[in-house]
A protein has these predicted regions:
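Catalytic cores of phosphodiester-bond hydrolases, prominently lipid phosphodiesterases
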Residues: 35-367
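C-terminal motif of bacterial Sec signal peptides marking the signal peptidase cleavage site
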Residues: 31-32
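Coiled-coil-like amphipathic alpha-helices with heptad-repeat character
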Residues: 1-2, 14, 354-356
Length: 367
């Protein structure tokens, strides 16, 4: 049995040509990538899902990607920004997906009598392009329906409760997601787990699903490092903690061997924990491109994330903005690219996703 951690760096790896990102030269690091061996898993695509036209869909897996994402993806600039870190604005979600090549988003949710509201902070930073979670989910789903050839969308959900009133109703959260995205259109813990004892065991012994098995889907992840995460796990970390659940949950570094460990948000793209996570097949997200930081510092963070194989690179600037020279456009992406650490040899960005066949040949099952 070959473990998922196994990889070999190609000899004579060649650095890609530097790419100018809004007048600043960003060298993205080595394109030479590791060869991550996988055992063919028990993930069989639904009979209703036709070939989308990608020749390596039965080989490339979900953790072979490097994806452009946005931080606080719903965010609108406050009318009066009191602090610099709030002074930015994101385009509507469908514009981010369709025009900017974003494939990973973050949504902050707050419980209310209307359902889950989506915004950053009460009063001082509360403007949003989609006021309710169900609205945001609908925007993402409609875009996906129209573009079934996309690789999975990654959606971080961060529960926020400023009053500290207790745990979220996690069953209600699952139900709200399922009211828009049916299970057959999701990458769920159950899909990854298959017949194995736990998600972790499946990732180690089988690997993530292939892209062909999960095109046109979305993958939801709970971004919480403590109480709300534990509530979603029903207070336990055993093999069955995610049974029936819709979302994966963030794994802290001390949790990387726990049965639920599959995704991790490691804010610092230079962290040594990233390499440890990649060795275990964990999908990693990091923050790059903050409104709070200088253009120079943002470039440094982006370079580190690209070079270190972070899968989901999220930031405040997915497109050029007035007053800043930094913005993030994936080097060599179409719009995503092959991960420089985990993808197999010969992987091309158009194997991951290609604009010319984004609309696919048929709609995925459950559309």
């Amino acid at each position: 049995m070959e473990r998922i951690a196994r990889k070999a760096v190609k000899k004579n790896a060649v650095a890609p040509e530097p790419r100018v990102i809004a007048l600043l030269l960003v060298v993205c690091g080595l394109s030479g990538c590791g060869i991550a061996s996988r055992i063919r898993g028990a993930f069989e695509p639904s009979a209703e899902v036709a070939d989308q036209g990608y020749s390596r869909d039965d080989e490339l897996r979900l953790n072979h990607l490097q994806v452009k994402g946005t931080h606080n993806s719903y965010h609108r600039r406050p009318r009066f920004a009191l602090v610099r870190e709030h002074d930015y604005e994101q385009a509507p979600l469908d514009v981010q997906l369709g025009e900017y090549g974003v494939r990973a988003v973050e949504l902050d949710i707050h419980p209310s009598s209307r359902g889950y509201e989506v915004y950053h902070l009460p009063v001082i930073d509360s403007r949003s392009t989609c006021a309710l979670l169900i609205d945001c989910l609908g925007v993402l789903k409609r875009w996906s329906d129209s573009n079934p050839g996309h690789h999975p969308l990654f959606v971080w959900i961060e529960p926020k409760d400023e009053l500290g009133g207790g745990d979220f109703d996690m069953d209600a959260l699952d139900a709200e997601i399922l009211s828009v995205w049916p299970r057959e259109r999701l990458v769920t813990p159950a899909l990854v787990k298959g017949g194995r004892e736990s998600v972790r065991e499946a990732i180690v012994e089988v690997g993530w699903p292939t892209l062909g098995e999960v095109r046109g889907r979305a993958m939801f992840m709970l971004l919480d490092r403590g109480r709300q995460r534990d509530a979603y796990l029903r207070g336990g970390k055993g093999p069955g903690a995610l049974d029936g659940r819709v979302l994966f949950v963030h794994a802290n570094p001390v949790d990387f061997d726990e049965p639920f460990a599959a995704v991790a948000k490691i804010d610092d793209p230079s962290s040594a924990h990233i390499a440890a996570a990649l060795e275990k097949g964990i999908i990693v997200g990091s923050n790059v491109g903050s409104a709070l930081l200088s253009d120079e510092r943002n470039i440094q963070k982006l370079q580190a994330g690209l070079r270190n194989g972070v899968h989901l690179l999220t930031g405040d600037y997915p497109a050029p903005v007035k007053g800043r020279t930094y913005w993030f456009d994936m080097p060599g992406g179409s719009p995503s690219r092959c991960n420089p650490i985990t993808a197999p040899a010969g992987c091309a960005s158009t194997d991951v996703e290609a604009p010319g066949i984004l609309r696919g040949r048929t709609r995925p099952a459950g559309g």
